[in-house]
């Protein structure tokens, strides 16, 4: 049994990205583990939490699929998909989820997204999370450009993205499909030199 634990430890360290976990003042953005299922599902079933996300509210099976994909992505090399748990640094309590996906490797471009459980809205955690993702993208992955999509009605996210220095580049008409309707999205982006100039 001891050899198996050593092998598993070596394997995990081989796949662990040097940019992870991401530290912010109050949070850790870390890789998901299987034991996070109940904490993720608790918030992912909430229609208010998933109102502006691409999917949700989740069924049990949806959360299982999400976590399975997140765990599988951790072992792909080169790694291009970072779906991460947002947890309190002090006690590892899960507040939500975030992600950074390298969507255009040749152009060094990535896409970020996030959601937080309702009890944690209005405390600056979303801004802290996005700042952490930008650090991972620009410093850890050496990306040139990071984008985000945002529903025009999602005033909180618009405020958050603009606060971290992302600029609105346009309105994508009928870009996504949810609740049986095609919906417009705002496109936000930030370049590496803009992030550096803003003092990270």
Where do the protein language model's features map onto the residues?
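Short histidine-centered catalytic/ligand-binding loop motif
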Residues: 52-57
């Amino acid at each position: 049994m001891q050899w198996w634990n050593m092998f598993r430890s070596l394997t995990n360290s081989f796949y662990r990205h040097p940019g992870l976990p991401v530290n912010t003042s109050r949070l850790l953005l870390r890789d998901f583990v299987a034991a996070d299922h109940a904490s993720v599902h608790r918030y992912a079933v909430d229609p208010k939490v998933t109102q502006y996300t691409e999917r949700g509210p989740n069924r049990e099976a949806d959360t299982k699929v999400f976590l399975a994909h997140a765990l599988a992505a951790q072992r792909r090399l080169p790694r291009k998909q970072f779906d991460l748990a947002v947890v309190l640094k002090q006690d590892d309590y899960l507040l939500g989820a975030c992600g950074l996906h390298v969507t255009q490797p040749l152009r060094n471009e990535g896409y970020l997204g996030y959601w937080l459980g309702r009890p944690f809205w209005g405390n600056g955690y979303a801004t802290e999370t996005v700042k952490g993702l930008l650090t991972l993208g620009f410093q850890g992955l050496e990306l040139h450009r990071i984008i985000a999509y945002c529903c025009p009605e999602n005033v909180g996210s618009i405020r958050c993205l603009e606060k971290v220095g992302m600029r609105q580049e346009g309105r994508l008409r009928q870009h996504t499909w949810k609740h049986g309707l095609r919906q417009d999205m705002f496109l936000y982006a930030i370049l590496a030199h803009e992030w550096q100039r803003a003092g990270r």
